């Protein structure tokens, strides 16, 4: 098993257990404890895990972005449930904005089953996946984000998106506060989502429970600005909102 594959599997296991010992990871992966320790040291240096005496857990800091290959393992079962609920709100012939989040990628995996959908995305991974199927897909172009290698950002991306109007915008963020505000730590990605939100008739936020009751650096939007929030937890009591029907439990 290559180093990158080991690191992906470590993150996947920690996503399931929240906390694990070196011995547990060694046994589950059939890899020596010394190799596990080296991998954990590298992951900690990259800000992806927190080590303590005898154990390790995923870092919770919202100021750092976990690479897409690892984020796609985080809460993957919950994200797939959320994606199914989101896909049910997308209809034949819809034009769909997808952002570069791992949550939106799981929605992309379901779109080939919906007839006549057109997708506009700044996600390299989503565009690559959809290119294998009969789904009309437009990749925005732009600069590869230095922080999140899986998405395209910058002025060219924004100019492209401003010229397009969609039926649905599907997106996620890093943090959602109790007062209904959404946040992310990267200004470039916030700017892109702002255009998607503005130019879509219907807006869907994908929000697994790990994002709740948190804030990050840059304000993105408010629940008042969107039609649906889909989560793996019941949000009717989380938000003080007079329109609870916008919250969908996946």
Give residue ranges: language-model regions:
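Conserved phosphate- and dinucleotide-binding cores of soluble alpha/beta proteins
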Residues: 2-5, 12, 19-23, 30, ...
